[in-house]
């Protein structure tokens, strides 16, 4: 089949930088004019142009894209009958930072990782730099008389071994309203997370990616609903003496209901139920504990240059799905009053972020979040109780495809015994997308 090469004009893509939020920017890329080049030099009919535009618009629609995800690419290939298109894109991202305080060596700034014992640190300060976050993606979009619209998506980035190894990030297929593959969990809302430079982000962020089967439908009235079954990933604090990990026997079930007013403002209620197992080595029996979580998230524009981001999550047995607690094993904790038994502790997290656009190409944001673990009485005093995180940043889009930014991060960790320590980070970033 003869292929057609498409080039998205840079002048048209400039529309993206005038958007108020990262959601606006990514959607604006879909509205960019496209200059079409057919290798054979043939002209398109109006019907073919309309078909191409419909497919290109489909290319960018995604309910699960966040600020750090790649934007729409400049380059696409399309079949001669305009029924199949393939886009190739990516980004080159460089981050640098300077830590002040007791932060454990890590690319991501997480309050959980603050070193509570000063004797474990030879120096309070640390300089770091990393190309992690650099990535590539491929998306194929097609249309079939029997299947309707379908798409295949593969994304990888250099976050693997030693933070430079290539690692699969997403790989899924969507046919109509059905998605199957390795994709963002239905229990999450990346679009409601504020812009950040640091790889970790807000310490309550739900950011799980897993193998799933999802049905999602958008209604004309602005409502969207989704339900999925997902492969679970759990983290259980077993000791190998009285308790041990047990195999997974039941998938997670997740769902959300969302109402959107306008293309980039919405409120979403998400939920998840799961089964987390462990082995009681004293009685030699396997037990299952019920886990569940709810997430309320929203983003919108109360004023033209202002964007608000907000999330609130609560649950039991869902700590391994993101945020501060993903650094530990808190889906199940040992019951100190009953050896051999475990329980699912409750956890609460919230985040509020504001973004202000000074100019179409310059914007700033500030965010504050907290995560709290509600462990039972008798938990060791050195265990994590809560963490606080705050950041302020400034971004400049030098061109529609080149972005630079600076950021200040602050974090605090408080243990069960009340002992607390803080850390600070100054970071910078420059990235080019294509």
Kindly label every feature range from the protein language model.
Residues 99, 143, 157-163, 187-189, ...:
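Sequence/structural signature of outer-membrane beta-barrel proteins
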Residues 79-109, 119-235, 254, 258-261, ...:
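Outer membrane beta-barrel
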Residues 131-153, 253-281, 357, 361-369, ...:
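Surface-exposed extracellular loop regions of Gram-negative outer-membrane beta-barrel proteins
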Residues 260-378, 383-384:
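Detector for outer-membrane/organellar transmembrane beta-barrel domains
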Residues 396-398, 421-434:
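Outer-membrane beta-barrel "beta-signal"
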Residues 19-100:
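N-terminal periplasmic/intermembrane-space "pro-region" immediately following the signal or transit peptide
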Residues 1-24:
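Bacterial Sec-dependent N-terminal signal peptides
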């Amino acid at each position: 089949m003869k292929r057609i090469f498409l080039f998205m004009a840079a002048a048209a893509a400039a529309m993206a930088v005038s958007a108020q939020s990262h959601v606006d920017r990514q959607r604006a890329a879909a509205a960019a004019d496209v200059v079409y080049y057919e290798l054979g030099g043939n002209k398109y009919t109006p019907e073919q142009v309309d078909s191409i535009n419909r497919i290109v618009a489909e290319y960018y629609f995604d309910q699960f894209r966040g600020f750090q995800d790649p934007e729409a690419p400049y380059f696409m290939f399309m079949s001669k009958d305009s029924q199949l298109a393939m886009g190739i894109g990516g980004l080159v991202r460089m981050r640098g930072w300077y830590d002040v305080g007791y932060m454990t060596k890590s690319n991501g700034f997480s309050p959980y990782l603050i070193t509570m014992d000063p004797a474990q640190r030879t120096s309070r300060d640390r300089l770091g730099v990393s190309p992690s976050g650099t990535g590539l993606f491929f998306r194929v979009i097609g249309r079939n008389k029997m299947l309707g619209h379908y798409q295949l998506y593969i994304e990888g980035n250099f976050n693997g071994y030693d933070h430079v190894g290539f690692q699969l990030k997403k790989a899924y297929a969507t046919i109509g309203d059905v998605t199957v593959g390795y994709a963002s969990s239905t229990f999450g809302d990346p679009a409601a997370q504020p812009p950040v430079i640091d790889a970790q982000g807000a310490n309550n962020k739900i950011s799980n990616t897993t193998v799933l089967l999802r049905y999602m439908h958008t209604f004309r009235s602005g409502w969207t609903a989704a339900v999925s079954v997902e492969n679970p990933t759990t983290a259980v604090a077993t000791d190998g003496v009285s308790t041990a990990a047990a195999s997974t026997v039941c998938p997670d079930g997740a769902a959300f209901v969302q109402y959107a007013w306008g293309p980039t403002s919405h409120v979403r209620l998400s939920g998840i139920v799961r089964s987390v197992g462990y082995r009681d080595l004293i009685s030699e029996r396997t037990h299952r504990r019920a886990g569940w979580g709810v997430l309320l998230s929203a983003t919108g524009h109360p004023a033209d240059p202002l964007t608000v981001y907000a999330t609130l999550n609560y649950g039991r047995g869902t700590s391994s799905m993101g945020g501060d607690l993903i650094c530990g094993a808190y889906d199940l904790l040992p019951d100190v009053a009953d050896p051999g038994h475990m329980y699912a502790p409750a956890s609460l997290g919230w985040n509020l972020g504001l973004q202000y656009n000074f100019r179409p190409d310059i914007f700033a944001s500030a965010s504050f979040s907290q995560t709290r673990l509600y462990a039972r009485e008798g938990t060791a005093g050195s265990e994590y109780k809560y963490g606080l995180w705050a950041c302020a940043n400034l971004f400049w889009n030098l061109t529609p495809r080149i972005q630079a930014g600076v950021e200040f991060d602050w974090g605090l960790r408080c243990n069960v015994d009340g002992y607390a320590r803080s850390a600070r980070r100054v970071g910078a970033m420059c990235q080019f997308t294509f």
